[in-house]
């Protein structure tokens, strides 16, 4: 009987151990289930108010009451609409927890939202470089593409049976989304580079530095956009990364738009001096700008050589805001002829040539007046700002003005 009692005791102990293990496993699963939505909800709780603020601010904040800011306002409002669409997406996730209730519906909503927002984001950015970019044809094209994409996504998610075919179709749609985003981003980059070329050929000041954020944001948007597309299909416990990563991304966008407002008028005036019609703009122009070849200009520059030399002697290049149009009027010549002369003679763009003259002027001042401060030196040499002067000086000389002064005056 004692042996039988020992057997019963062992069975009871084993049963209790199994129950304890099951309880621990169940408890751990409950913790996991509880923790994932809480982190996910916290990330949405953090991002959603910011998104709503950015969206409504972009839509309704005032700009200076000048006609020239009309295009900036339209661009910012389009960006505001995109931000509010994303906010609506976040709200559905936050208040209804759709990802945990119906994953297919969440994927459809995310992909459809991203597709539409890609169009809005690219349109808003390119508008800052090309006021004629948005046309009825382009708007309808993007709307039709969005409807087709959303419809196909719905068919794949809700009508196709789960399996290899559905996964392959989802992968194809994800590739379409990414390619669409990359194509739009490429348009922004082409527009940006075209604008930089225009500024370098026509402006003495480094106007391009004011639109550099467009290039930075676009490359960031490509990485972020592709990441969002991939994170849509990741396990639930990693989704909060997608939400939290949006905070610095959209914060940078907000800061850039606010900062650009300070320089927009100067940039737009630079555009207006050289772009007069829709044909000259950079909308769909994906080729290099037409450059005057040496064969198309007179072989001899005898007439202009003396004029340019005399103008350099007067230190006319230190004038801030100087343009090739103004210089051509001073020298009584035309812009095409002057631009070709600069490229052929100095192997530089107009801006690079003027910058080199200003830097030589600054170095001469440093030699004669080593006590001068950098801010005054930058202004007297014709540079827009102290930082712009230091950047240009360092790029050419390989050291800062302060180090150059010590090395050359000791």
Residue ranges and their predicted role:
Residues 56-59, 120-128, 180-200, 254-256:
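Alpha-helical transmembrane segments in multipass membrane proteins, preferentially the mid-helix core
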Residues 63, 91-101, 153-165, 226-235:
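Juxtamembrane "helix-exit" motif on the non-cytosolic side of transmembrane helices
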Residues 67-88, 142-143, 168-231, 241-250:
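Alpha-helical transmembrane segments of multi-pass integral membrane proteins
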Residues 215-284:
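Hydrophobic, helix-length membrane anchors
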Residues 257-376, 381, 392-395, 402-410:
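Membrane-proximal linker segments that couple transmembrane helices to downstream signaling/catalytic modules
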């Amino acid at each position: 009987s004692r042996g039988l009692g020992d057997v019963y005791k062992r069975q009871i102990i084993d049963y209790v151990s199994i129950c304890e293990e099951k309880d621990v496993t169940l408890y751990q699963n409950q913790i996991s289930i509880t923790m994932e939505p809480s982190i996910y909800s916290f990330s949405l709780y953090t991002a959603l108010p910011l998104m709503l603020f950015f969206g409504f601010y972009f839509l309704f904040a005032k700009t200076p009451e000048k006609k020239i800011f009309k295009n900036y306002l339209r661009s910012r409002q389009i960006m505001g609409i995109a931000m509010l669409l994303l906010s609506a997406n976040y709200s559905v996730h936050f208040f209804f927890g759709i990802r945990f209730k119906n994953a297919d519906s969440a994927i459809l909503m995310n992909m459809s939202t991203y597709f539409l927002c890609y169009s809005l984001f690219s349109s808003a950015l390119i508008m800052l470089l090309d006021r004629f970019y948005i046309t009825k044809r382009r708007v309808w094209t993007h709307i039709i593409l969005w409807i087709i994409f959303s419809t196909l996504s719905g068919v794949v998610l809700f009508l196709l049976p789960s399996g290899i075919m559905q996964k392959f179709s989802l992968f194809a749609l994800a590739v379409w989304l990414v390619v669409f985003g990359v194509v739009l981003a490429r348009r922004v980059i082409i527009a940006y580079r075209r604008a930089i070329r225009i500024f370098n050929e026509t402006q003495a000041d480094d106007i391009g530095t004011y639109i550099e954020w467009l290039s930075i944001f676009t490359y960031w948007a490509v990485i972020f956009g592709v990441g969002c597309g991939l994170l849509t299909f990741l396990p639930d416990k990693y989704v909060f990364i997608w939400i939290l990563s949006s905070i610095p991304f959209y914060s940078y966008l907000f800061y850039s738009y606010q900062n650009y407002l300070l320089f927009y008028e100067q940039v737009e005036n630079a555009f207006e001096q050289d772009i007069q019609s829709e044909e000259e703009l950079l909308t769909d122009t994906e080729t290099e700008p037409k450059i005057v070849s040496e064969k198309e200009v007179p072989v001899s520059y005898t007439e202009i050589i003396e004029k340019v030399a005399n103008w350099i002697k007067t230190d006319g290049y230190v004038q801030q805001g100087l343009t090739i149009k103004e210089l051509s009027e001073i020298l009584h010549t035309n812009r095409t002829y002057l631009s070709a002369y600069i490229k052929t003679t100095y192997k530089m763009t107009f801006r690079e040539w003027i910058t080199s003259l200003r830097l030589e002027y600054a170095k001469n001042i440093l030699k004669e007046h080593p006590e001068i401060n950098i801010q005054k030196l930058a202004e007297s040499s014709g540079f827009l700002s102290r930082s712009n002067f230091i950047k240009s000086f360092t790029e050419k000389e390989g050291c800062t003005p302060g180090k150059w002064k010590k090395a050359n005056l000791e």
